[in-house]
A protein has these predicted regions:
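Short alpha-helical segments enriched in small residues
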Residues: 1-168
Length: 168
C-alpha cells in the first residue's frame, strides 16, 4: 500500500475540520516524527482557524518536556517513542492551547534510528479529549521517511476524526 498523498491528507484534514466545527470544538497538535505535517494538513483548508488552535513540533525530548509538560521520568522510563509519551503529548497539547481535543504522534520515521524493539516505521498516535482518558494506537509503516511521516499523519487525523464521531 502506498503512503497517502498530500491531497489525501488535506481531504482528511478538511473532514476532521468539518466534524470539529459541527461540535464547536477546537484542536491542538503535538508532533514529533511528523514535523508539522498534521498541522499542515489541517491548515490547507480555508477557515481552519475556526477549529485549529495551533501545534507544537516537539522533536527533541527537551521540547516535549518544556513545551508540553511531559515528565522527564516518563520519557526515561518508556522512551520518547511510546504509548505513554504519545498520551502525555496529546494531553499536553490540549492543555497548552486550552482546546477540547489534542492529537499527537511520536515515532521513528527512518531511515535510521530504529531498534529491534522499536523498528523504523514504528509510530504511536494519540488523541485526548477533555474529561476523557487519552487513547493511543500503535502503527507500523514500511515506507521511506516521507512515506512513514505521511502515513503517521494520516493515522493521527483518522484517530481524531474517529474520536469526534464517538462523542456523538
Amino acid at each position: 500500500m502506498n503512503p497517502p498523498s498530500e491531497a489525501e491528507l488535506a481531504r482528511l484534514g478538511a473532514r476532521l475540520g468539518d466534524a470539529l466545527r459541527a461540535r464547536d470544538w477546537r484542536l491542538a497538535t503535538a508532533e514529533s516524527s511528523t514535523g508539522g505535517l498534521i498541522g499542515h494538513a489541517i491548515t490547507m483548508t480555508p477557515g481552519a482557524s475556526d477549529y485549529y488552535a495551533g501545534g507544537v513540533i516537539c522533536y527533541s525530548n527537551l521540547a516535549k518536556e518544556r513545551a508540553l509538560g511531559v515528565p522527564h521520568d516518563l520519557i526515561e522510563a518508556h522512551g520518547a517513542v511510546s504509548e505513554e509519551v504519545a498520551a502525555a503529548l496529546a494531553v499536553g497539547a490540549a492543555h497548552l492551547f486550552e482546546t477540547e481535543m489534542g492529537i499527537s504522534v511520536t515515532g521513528i520515521a527512518g531511515p535510521d534510528g530504529g531498534s529491534e524493539r522499536k523498528p523504523v516505521g514504528s509510530h504511536y498516535v494519540g488523541v485526548a479529549r477533555r474529561g476523557h482518558p487519552a487513547r493511543v494506537e500503535h502503527r507500523a509503516f514500511a515506507h521511506d521517511r516521507e512515506g512513514n511521516q505521511a502515513a503517521a499523519a494520516m493515522a493521527a487525523l483518522q484517530l481524531a476524526l474517529d474520536e469526534v464521531a464517538a462523542a456523538a
